[in-house]
Amino acid sequence: PIPLPSGIGLEACGVIEEVGPEVKLFKVGDRVSHASMPIGAYSEKHIMPENKLVPVPDGVSDEVASCVTLKGITAEYLLHRAYPLKKGDKVLYHAAAGALGQILCPWANSIGAEIIGTVGSKEKEGIAKKNGCHHVINYTDKDFVEEVEKIVGKNGIDVVYDGVGLKTFEGSIEVLKIRGMMVAFGNASGYVDTIDVKKHINAKGLFFTRPSIAHYTIEREELLESAKKVFNAVLSGKFKIKISKFGKIEEVFRLLFD
């Protein structure tokens, strides 16, 4: 738990106004972004350790960098390192209309994967399609396990990227192919507390990982390389960031609730 009182926010972009006497990596005037602790990004000024910051290239606006650093790095490590996605891979991605789906799905599409996205409402089906999904399943009115089998047959899915958790876990395991990969990176619907190795892993020789951004940016070189790939993907048009609302800092909470 975060000790209270506390600021909030983990992701921001801005220009450095002051540096400490031992700072070597950046100087006043550099434009940087971050996607990590210490918390407090939703503020006019924020003190950050230099090793958590990344340079923002020309051509990437402050607004886009503020939106893409955390989710972009997440998409990068999921697609390139947790499971290195290949052309022709069949992918199941849950919550495909969300903010991360806006980045990950078109990026996966650019690699040449076939993407099946799940959503939780009728209005989100079109969003998932725009995000690059070749097939969209609304799991509130259809069994996604049955629908996936209709699309790919009984051979199954190469990789499932599951940020939903408890609600989708069993079905995600079921649709994977022999030696498929389960990338469980979130728990929006609740935590999966127990994994039955015999039932969930051994039955099909599955691979399982529970990654987080901290695991994949533990070395500064990893953070820099990941951020570079993200910003290059933005500049090359592999995905586009849609920002629905802008506002002053004092309006942030109202905009979030709206």
Regions found by a protein language model. Name each.
Residues 69-141:
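Mid-domain Rossmann-like dinucleotide-binding core that forms the NAD(H)/NADP(H) cofactor-binding site
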Residues 190-203:
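Rossmann-fold NAD(P)-binding glycine/threonine-rich loop
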Residues 220-258:
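C-terminal hydrophobic helical "lid"/dimerization subdomain
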Residues 109-171, 219-223:
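Adenosine-nucleotide cofactor-binding segment
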Residues 180-181:
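Glycine-centered, small-residue-biased loops immediately flanking beta-strands
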Residues 1-38:
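Glycine-rich beta-strand-centered segment in the early N-terminal region that forms part
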